[in-house]
């Protein structure tokens, strides 16, 4: 059986001379995912097999996550990692508490009002701060931005790929 991989980030550049790389994170739980000692897999152009690396250090710098790997600790050793996609296998995703979901479970879900009217599909999740914001693609209309808060999101069924929301006034531009 083929292994299922999930993107958790992309290396966009190097940082300094001590082998750190700048990562744009695409993971729901960055602090957990990039914890020192964790194993990540780098998928690079021109290579058939992923490169396995172990996180040595992790810190935030501006909008980037800076990672250093135990296997590569200087600028020359990480230069070739630019543009690598960072992934983890499905079995490393871990269990979530009730009411918690991975981004890949939410993206692609159809969003309905409590009255059953289809609004659109979740196409992206933004993480600006206090709560996540779901970007809902709508046919022939501007994308809708829905905050992931209890007063708006009423029911999520990831198996059926359906989400029900309470459509508050002004939440969606027609």
Curated annotation (Swiss-Prot):
Pfam families: PRC, RimM
Disulfide bonds: none
GO process terms (BP): maturation of SSU-rRNA
Chaperone in keyword set: yes
UniProt domain PRC barrel: residue ranges: 98-171
GO terms, molecular function: ribosome binding
Sorted UniProt keywords: Chaperone, Cytoplasm, Ribosome biogenesis, rRNA processing
Alphabetized NCBIfam families for the sequence: 16S_RimM
HAMAP family named among the record's database cross-references: Ribosome_mat_RimM (MF_00014)
Family note: Belongs to the RimM family.
Domain characteristics, as noted in the entry: The PRC barrel domain binds ribosomal protein uS19.
Function (record text): An accessory protein needed during the final step in the assembly of 30S ribosomal subunit, possibly for assembly of the head region. Essential for efficient processing of 16S rRNA. May be needed both before and after RbfA during the maturation of 16S rRNA. It has affinity for free ribosomal 30S subunits but not for 70S ribosomes.
The protein's name in its UniProt record: Ribosome maturation factor RimM
Organism: Bacillus subtilis (strain 168)
């Amino acid at each position: 059986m083929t292994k299922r991989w999930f993107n958790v980030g992309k290396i966009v550049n190097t940082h300094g001379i001590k082998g750190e790389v700048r990562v744009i994170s695409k993971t729901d739980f960055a602090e957990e995912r990039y914890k020192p000692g964790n194993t990540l897999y780098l998928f690079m152009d021109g290579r058939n097999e992923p490169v396995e690396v172990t996180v040595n250090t992790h810190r935030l710098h501006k909008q980037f996550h800076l990672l250093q790997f135990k296997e590569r600790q200087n600028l020359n050793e990480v230069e070739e990692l630019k543009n690598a996609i960072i992934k983890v296998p499905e079995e490393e995703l871990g269990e979530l508490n009730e009411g918690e979901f991975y981004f890949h479970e939410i993206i692609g879900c159809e969003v309905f009002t409590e009255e059953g009217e289809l609004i659109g599909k979740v196409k992206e999740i933004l993480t600006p701060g206090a709560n996540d914001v779901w970007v809902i693609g709508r046919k022939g209309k501007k994308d809708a931005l829905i905050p992931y808060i209890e007063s708006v999101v009423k029911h999520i069924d990831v198996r059926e790929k359906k989400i029900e929301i309470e459509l508050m006034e002004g939440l969606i531009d027609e």
